[in-house]
């Protein structure tokens, strides 16, 4: 009998390697399902084992191809519901469609994050688990419980293992100050802020650096790296101000377009990301990019949800500061 007899984990095609690592930590087998496509491109899902009354988790990021991966979650949830699963949790480490979380004044645009929340709920999902939401307020778009866990303990563990000298934490923009301040506090080090203005989407201009980075090892922390334009410009600005080294730690490795090439040819000494999104072949081959797995943290979170234990306990300030929250 498995260690967690009522817990089952299924996955789609988005990130099967992460799912395998999570169930390995839980000492259970990955749920068997046939996930593919019909000849016309429609998503096809069939569960290959009994789920009646079980506590089921669908572990799947909605990274690219975003629409296919989202539809796999929705169709799998429907299949689980019709097969009488006891509880269905969508564990979505990277929650796509999170960037449109409001309707700017006079703009005729959707609030896509709310739309996706409605779709997940309508499909029969009882609970959502995600990692480092792009905007915390998205939790309020759901009428079901949402656990937004943080990759901070995983990243801090990796940072401490590197034993960096003369470290200073850098927020890449004003919006990331809360995250950067929490990391700086846990590491008992200084904080710097990059003040930038973004003239249009995915284009950033570094304007000013608040804090003295001369001769320091600069640690940029962010929730995601998309095109890497902002990150590379920030690294150049820090080096121009006398930074000795520039490192970047981020949760989600989106790496759109020429992001990997930009990182490879930039002033960044090392980029560390988690495995919420699988790396492309180019990213895996890049010597400047390294992965710190979040599988252990996700496994412990799933275990706690299954056993009705506190999830917020994992992010107790003292435990995070010492690394004791990780399994």
From Swiss-Prot:
The active site is at 196. Its cofactor is Mg(2+). It is found in: Cytoplasm. It comes from the Bacteria. Pathway: Metabolic intermediate biosynthesis; 5-phospho-alpha-D-ribose 1-diphosphate biosynthesis; 5-phospho-alpha-D-ribose 1-diphosphate from D-ribose 5-phosphate (route I): step 1/1. Mg(2+) 2 binds at residue 173. Binds 2 Mg(2+) ions per subunit. GO terms for molecular function: ATP binding; kinase activity; magnesium ion binding; ribose phosphate diphosphokinase activity. Mg(2+) 1 binds at residue 134. SUPFAM superfamilies: PRTase-like (SSF53271). ATP binds at residues 40-42, 99-100. Its EC number is 2.7.6.1. D-ribose 5-phosphate binds at residues 198, 222, 226-230. GO terms for cellular component: cytoplasm; ribose phosphate diphosphokinase complex. Its main location: cytoplasm. It catalyses: D-ribose 5-phosphate + ATP = 5-phospho-alpha-D-ribose 1-diphosphate + AMP + H(+). One of its GO terms (biological process) is ribonucleoside monophosphate biosynthetic process. Keywords: ATP-binding, Cytoplasm, Kinase, Magnesium, Metal-binding, Nucleotide biosynthesis, Nucleotide-binding, Transferase. Homohexamer. Belongs to the ribose-phosphate pyrophosphokinase family. Class I subfamily. Involved in the biosynthesis of the central metabolite phospho-alpha-D-ribosyl-1-pyrophosphate (PRPP) via the transfer of pyrophosphoryl group from ATP to 1-hydroxyl of ribose-5-phosphate (Rib-5-P). This is Ribose-phosphate pyrophosphokinase. It comes from Chromobacterium violaceum (strain ATCC 12472 / DSM 30191 / JCM 1249 / CCUG 213 / NBRC 12614 / NCIMB 9131 / NCTC 9757 / MK).
């Amino acid at each position: 009998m498995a260690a967690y007899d009522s817990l089952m984990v299924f996955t789609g095609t988005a990130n099967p390697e992460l799912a395998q690592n999570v169930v390995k930590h839980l000492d259970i087998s990955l749920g068997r399902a046939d996930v593919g496509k019909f000849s016309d491109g429609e998503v096809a899902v069939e569960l290959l084992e009994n789920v009646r009354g079980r506590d089921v988790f669908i572990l799947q990021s909605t990274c690219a191809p975003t629409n296919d991966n989202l539809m796999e979650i929705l169709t799998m949830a429907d299949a689980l519901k019709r097969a009488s699963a006891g509880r269905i949790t969508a564990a979505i480490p990277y929650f796509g469609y999170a960037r449109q979380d409001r309707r700017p004044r006079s703009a005729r645009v959707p609030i896509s994050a709310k739309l996706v929340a409605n779709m997940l709920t309508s499909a029969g999902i009882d609970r959502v688990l995600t990692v480092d939401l792009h905007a915390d307020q998205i939790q309020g778009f759901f009428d079901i419980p949402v656990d937004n866990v943080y990759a901070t303990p995983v990243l801090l563990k990796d940072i401490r293992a590197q034993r960096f000298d003369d470290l200073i934490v850098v927020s890449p923009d004003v919006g990331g100050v809360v995250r950067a301040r929490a990391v700086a506090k846990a590491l008992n080090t200084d904080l710097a802020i990059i003040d930038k203005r973004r003239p249009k989407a995915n284009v950033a201009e570094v304007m000013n650096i608040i804090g003295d980075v001369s001769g320091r090892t600069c640690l940029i922390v962010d929730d995601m790296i998309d095109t890497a334009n902002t990150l590379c410009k920030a690294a150049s600005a820090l080096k121009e101000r006398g930074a000795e080294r520039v490192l970047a730690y981020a949760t989600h490795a989106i790496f759109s377009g020429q992001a990997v090439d930009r990182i490879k040819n930039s002033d960044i000494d090392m980029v560390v990301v988690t495995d919420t999104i699988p790396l492309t072949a180019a990213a895996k081959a890049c010597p400047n990019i390294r992965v710190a797995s979040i599988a252990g943290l996700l496994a412990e979170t799933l275990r706690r949800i299954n056993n009705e234990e506190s999830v917020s306990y994992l992010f107790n300030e003292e435990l995070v500061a010492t690394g004791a929250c990780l399994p």
